[in-house]
Amino acid sequence: VDTAEKLSKNGCASNYGATQISVWSMARALNASIPPLTNPMTPSMTFRNSNAGRISGVALVGVIIGGALALFLVVALGVVPYFFLHNTRDNNLAPKELTDPVTLIFTDIESSTALWAAHPELMPDAVATHHRLIRSLIGRYGCYEVKTVGDSFMIASKSPFAAVQLAQELQLCFLHHDWGTNAIDESYQQLEQQRAEEDAKYTPPTARLDLKVYSRLWNGLRVRVGIHTGLCDIRRDEVTKGYDYYGRTSNMAARTESVGNGGQVLMTTAAYMSLSAEEREQIDVTALGDVPLRGVAKPVEMYQLNAVPGRTFAGLRLEHELLNDDEDQTTTSCSDHSSSRTDLSVAAQTIAASLQSLLGTFTPAQRQKALIPFCERWRVPLPQKVGNVWDNDGCQEAIRRVAAKVGRVMDFGTRKASSSVTSLERGGSLFSAGGATVATVASSSNFSCVDGRCGTVQLIDLENDSTTS
């Protein structure tokens, strides 16, 4: 009992360990007077795991899978929302106070209809790049994208200087971007040469420049920009969940943009004087004097922002503004959004009827699937849909919008073709870019496009074929 109590005190009663260990002989086991072979001792027991500090294969696989899942969650919860929000309007940046002046920016691509007619395979990607570059600048300068219509942007800013910086950087950004082709620049130069041949008083600002000089000043799409500052009627659109700006300020900004040339930035005196003296010292402007604008009672004092030093421009497009010429309309004032059947040209109505007949046997879901690529490639806004599938009205609206855009391009080609045929009848020649002598003649259906790129056309080799149909 004494031994058991002693062992209990030493923590060995449950046989969890041993203390006072000694080695006895068999004789000692039979005779207690014989001493043990070794003196009693309590060893220090340290247990070691041979796999300590190592990871098993199964555990390693688990760590890899867990790490991959964690990385996926970071991407899903962080990066994806970033890109989603990056491509949407941030209403926090929208000017909302009715008593605070708003600076509005309107942009438009010069000769976009002609470019679509000449390069239908290039323009979808070029316009997508145009949108991406401008949206990156909107975010950089804390401005607000009000809307895009076709090739045009309407942008609002609480800060006049931020708006001016955006417009200046836009021109530099487009100049230094790699567009991957010279076709757009060649088309702009050809358009200038054609106008010079038709108008003896017109001097092409870029078509006759030395190649090295041209490359320092011009590259890719040419975007004209108009800026105006003033009070607006501000409304929140319950459909788009965004803010829109109405009234005289909006009209003035749009008119300012419409008289400019591609690559030119115009601002009204109201926008220029909204800048502080220090801000005005940071920009280079040229006073253009009073400029008459359609729908404005008195001429408006205008300034040109010299975003790219050395650029020269043709005279302001006052005749286009006053006559409301529709060859190269400012798409913010003539939208693809509302294209009723009666508003469509003959060519556009034929396109719409063809699409309706072609897709009439499809279900709404199939029609939507077929129409979306056309809308995306022609940069036509999609109709508002109810649920996941467009209804019949939505499909009809998409068809009308596509037909309106393509119809304008085809009408442009028809006018150019008619002009070319007229010049040929007078003894002139029309040469294609590759050097072959050709003429584009509209067929009886009035469908044609520049260089036979779309529609129903006839190409005639003037040297080898003297007959026409």
Swiss-Prot record:
Record carries keyword Transmembrane: yes
Residues that carry a glycan: N31
Location of the Guanylate cyclase domain: 103-257
Cofactors: Mg(2+)
Residues that span the membrane, as ranges: 60-80
Chief location: membrane
GO cellular component: plasma membrane
Cofactor descriptive note: Binds 1 Mg(2+) ion per subunit.
GO biological process entries: cAMP biosynthetic process; intracellular signal transduction
Positions on the Extracellular side per record topology: 1-59
Compartment list: Cell membrane
Cytoplasmic face residues: 81-469
Binding-site list for Mg(2+): D108, D151
Protein family: Belongs to the adenylyl cyclase class-3 family.
Function: Could act as a receptor for an unknown ligand.
Record's protein name: Receptor-type adenylate cyclase
Organism of origin: Trypanosoma equiperdum
